[in-house]
């Protein structure tokens, strides 16, 4: 892949992301393979200077992974300007794929200083709060449907907005 071309595509996607615009679809060679899509996503995220609210795991449904012939999900950054409080309105365009009900976990800061191996048992002690979340899923490109997991990955994880509910204290 040509770095100059990749940079040009990344600039278009970042511009669409920041200005809430819809652009022409990016070429399939950047989205067909998850490795190339990850590379594009990381380049795009490095060009954005807005604060990050957290991260999302995407492509976690096993049937979807099998259908798209992928082995593992990916993650993407969630930016603060895309996170809304409850009862806020969201503009939806025709390239919105739908909405998903998600669960959001607030993680304590000492999680990032933990030097031991993280397991299912000890991860619970790092969760401070849990809250419901509605994710508006869509593209910033004139594209319909999902042909590969790279389609979602390359477009900032296809997260348009997150609407957060009220947080509840997490009991271990």
Please place each PLM-identified region on the residue numbering.
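Catalytic-core "active-site belt" of small-molecule-metabolizing enzymes
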Residues: 2-172
């Amino acid at each position: 892949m040509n770095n100059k071309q990749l940079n040009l595509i990344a600039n278009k996607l970042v511009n669409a992301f920041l200005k809430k615009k819809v652009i022409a679809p990016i070429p399939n060679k950047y989205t067909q393979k998850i490795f190339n899509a990850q590379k594009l996503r990381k380049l795009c995220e490095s060009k954005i200077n807005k604060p990050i609210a957290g991260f999302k795991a995407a492509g976690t449904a096993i049937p979807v992974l099998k259908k798209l012939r992928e082995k593992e999900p990916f993650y993407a950054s969630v930016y603060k300007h895309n996170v809304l409080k409850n009862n806020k309105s969201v503009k939806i365009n025709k390239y919105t794929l739908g909405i998903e009900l998600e669960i959001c976990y607030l993680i304590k800061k000492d999680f990032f200083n933990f030097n031991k191996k993280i397991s299912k048992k000890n991860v619970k002690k790092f969760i401070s709060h849990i809250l419901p979340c509605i994710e508006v899923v869509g593209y910033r490109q004139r594209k319909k449907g999902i042909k590969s997991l790279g389609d979602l990955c390359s477009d900032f994880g296809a997260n348009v907005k997150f609407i957060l509910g009220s947080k509840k204290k997490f009991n271990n």
